[in-house]
Amino acid sequence: LQYFINTYNELNIIPMVHIDDNDSLHNMESFILSQSKKGRSIAARFPININNIDEYIKIITSTMTVNQKLFIILDSEQITESNIDEVIANLQLNMAKIKPILNENINAIIAGTSFPKTVADYGDKEGDIPIFEEYIYEKFQEPYVLYGDYASINIEQIEIKGGTFVPRIDVSLENIIFYK
């Protein structure tokens, strides 16, 4: 990673640390400190069900320089009709913990995807897929809270072996994606 960042420094690549409750704090601190010494912006990706986001962020911000930027990515992963209320509840808990520290140098990004693994649940040849991530973002939209999504893809990596690929056109509108 460091070689890549140094080689393409002019591209303003923002290194990201993925954090969950099982991570070693020492490894995270070492990575953040190494990037802070270089004055680079940092992104930290958290699952929305993390228990102590404020403790992790306190560690991160304690190593940051004055003008360094931090992007806190709250990753909702797959959002469906069956889990949207849980996603919103988890985001509310974590936003309440981080909202007091948000400013021009510390931004929150609410990310996720509602694009399904297969569109068959929405119709065989054509259909509409609700864009839940847009709906969720609108609930939390305010200064220093940014929108993020998975660019209309599903979070699962699917290996296609044999079979017939069926081309499809996806069109993203304000609240739905329709496909043909």
Model regions: which residues?
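C-terminal structured domain segments
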Residues: 161-180
